[in-house]
Amino acid sequence: MRIAVDGMGGDHSPSAVVEGCVQALEEFKDIEIYITGPEDLLKEAFSKFKYDKERVIFIDAKEVISTNEHPAMAVKKKKDSSLVKALRLVKDNQCEAVISAGSTGAFLTGCTLIVGRIKGVERPALAPVMPGKNGPFMIIDAGANVDSKPSYLVQFAKMGEVYFKSVMDVNNPKVGLVNIGEEEEKGNDLTKATYKLLKEEKDINFIGNVEPREVSTGDVDVLVCDGFVGNTVLKMYEGVASTILSMIKSEVKSSFLAKLGVPFLAPALMNLKKKMDYKEYGGAPFLGVKGICVKAHGSSDAKAFKNAIRQARKFHENDLIGKLSEEITKKSFDNQKKF
């Protein structure tokens, strides 16, 4: 499998990106890395490690898109940027996947404009998978579409369902709609209209509205919402997780008795920390585009980046894009038959 990597994306690039690539090359013998960025800088970063040089291809790119630039303008103007060149590799079928920890806006815009949407997809969506009490769950959309239509959300539900079936091996994923109450009539015009449409979808296992307090504790696989709500929920969830872990650490240090109990609690606490660590999940797939596009966290370290590569590899193994294309095409055909 050939994976394009934006070597200059993220807060700790290129060092963390390069180290993550080296770790992935060591663990996965069937991948090749096409890394974009200033070639001399990248080669210098790689020189600090031992790696299979035959499986790393350097693509020279002189420009970098920063997080404070206008996404669409930057993608269109900076043709020689590390991000655009990485996306072009997927567009031109030189790579099967692309990963970046850079500007989220530029990445999502570039994926849509350069890689292109799957035929029939109204709007691609960012779909991070998060740790929950009863197992991982997906938030879709988590920020790509701040303003959405009911038909978009129905398609998000379908894409999330396909993901859980093909990647997570869940036969009948439960789909919920994020709302301020469980009752059907609760919410705004968007959620009310979406609820009615989802209820009519016989091939989606729609369980109804899910309140924010049940996001991590409820028995649901796919949480559907517009990008504004999804991004808010995602960042709140990350913040709460970080705060809880910090509070536990402070309490343990606060008394002698608490410190005595650490050896007994350490395994459980370490397991909890691992479950709530975004680094374990690597990145969020951008579903609805023609290639495997994974957005890594901006503050990704080497471990997070390696896991983002692991994710991309798993998506490829499970033919996620092919299954999404098949399902969306089938759905579009079924809708045409109604008229």
From Swiss-Prot:
Reactions catalysed: a fatty acyl-[ACP] + phosphate = an acyl phosphate + holo-[ACP]
Keywords recorded for this protein, A-Z: Cytoplasm, Lipid biosynthesis, Lipid metabolism, Phospholipid biosynthesis, Phospholipid metabolism, Transferase
Subcellular location: Cytoplasm
Pathway: Lipid metabolism; phospholipid metabolism
A molecular-function term among this protein's GO annotations: phosphate:acyl-[acyl carrier protein] acyltransferase activity
Keyword Lipid metabolism: yes
Entry EC no(s): 2.3.1.274
Family: Belongs to the PlsX family.
Protein name: Phosphate acyltransferase
Gene: plsX
